[in-house]
């Protein structure tokens, strides 16, 4: 019976590898912020964004000011946030007010600035557990799941991306993820950017040197 167990293990491993390959970035072509998941014109029907506090929130909101008509106008939007100040800034955003519907989803910070290693590990575990529940509910509430998820900034965005990919793997339905690196990163990627780089469908940088250094990065000029 040992041979049967080996065959079953090989079959399961092959199936898992095929599924992971099918969901790998680039298999379905580049994500287009203004497109629908099935082609056609107009904004995607379901969008999820993340407001990561402070300057990260400011950059995301400026991005929406410029590209909101293509991205969120008329769409259903889920807004993840880690502090109430970011949520309030989102509520004041003209771009988000143009959405068909907006729901704000509180998320825990993966790491507080200045936290020690032990505290950072504990906060990351708590944030990961809470983010899984939030991401799963977002996919369920949006029926077919977010067609585009736009992320930037701190570690919580990486946690969100991780759970999206886990759920993609389980459901064999890929969520398009666009990660926008901060304007402040001129010569190297942030830690969050380095972690997100292999898993984002579109990895956008705002300086040409970064686009030359990282093969999958795309540069469209300064977006914010």
From Swiss-Prot:
TM ranges: 3-23
Topology in the lipid bilayer: Single-pass membrane protein
Cellular component terms (Gene Ontology): cytoplasmic side of Golgi membrane; lipid droplet; nuclear membrane; UDP-N-acetylglucosamine transferase complex
Coiled coil ranges: none
Function: Involved in protein N-glycosylation. Essential for the second step of the dolichol-linked oligosaccharide pathway. Anchors the catalytic subunit ALG13 to the ER.
Entry keywords, A to Z: Endoplasmic reticulum, Membrane, Nucleus, Transmembrane, Transmembrane helix
GO molecular-function term, one example from the UniProt record: N-acetylglucosaminyldiphosphodolichol N-acetylglucosaminyltransferase activity
A biological-process GO annotation: dolichol-linked oligosaccharide biosynthetic process
Pfam families linked: Alg14
Cytoplasmic side: 24-224
Keyword Translocase carried by entry: no
Name this protein carries in UniProt: UDP-N-acetylglucosamine transferase subunit ALG14
Record gene name: ALG14
Subcellular location: Endoplasmic reticulum membrane; Nucleus membrane
Topological domain ranges for the Lumenal compartment: 1-2
Self-association state and partner proteins as the record states: Heterodimer with ALG13 to form a functional enzyme.
Family note: Belongs to the ALG14 family.
């Amino acid at each position: 019976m040992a041979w049967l167990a080996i065959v079953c293990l090989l079959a399961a491993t092959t199936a898992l590898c095929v599924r992971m390959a099918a969901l790998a970035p680039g298999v379905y072509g580049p994500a287009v912020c203004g497109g629908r998941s099935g082609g056609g014109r107009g904004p995607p029907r379901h969008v999820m964004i993340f407001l990561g506090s402070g300057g990260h929130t400011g950059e995301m909101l400026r991005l929406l000011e410029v590209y909101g008509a293509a991205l969120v106008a008329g769409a259903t939007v889920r807004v993840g946030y880690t502090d109430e100040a970011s949520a309030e800034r989102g509520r004041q955003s003209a771009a988000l007010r143009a959405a068909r519907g907006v729901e704000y989803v509180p998320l825990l910070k993966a790491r507080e600035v200045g936290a020690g290693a032990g505290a950072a590990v504990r906060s990351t575990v708590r944030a990961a557990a809470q983010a899984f529940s939030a991401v799963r509910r977002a996919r369920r509430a949006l029926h077919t799941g977010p067609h585009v998820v736009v992320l930037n900034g701190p570690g919580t965005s990486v946690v969100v991306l991780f759970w999206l990919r886990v759920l993609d793997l389980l459901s064999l339905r890929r969520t398009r993820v666009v990660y926008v690196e901060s304007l402040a990163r001129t010569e190297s990627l942030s830690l969050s950017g380095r972690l997100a780089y292999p898993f984002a469908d579109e990895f956008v940088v705002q300086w040409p040197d970064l686009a030359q250094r990282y093969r999958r990065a795309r540069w469209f000029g300064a977006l914010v």
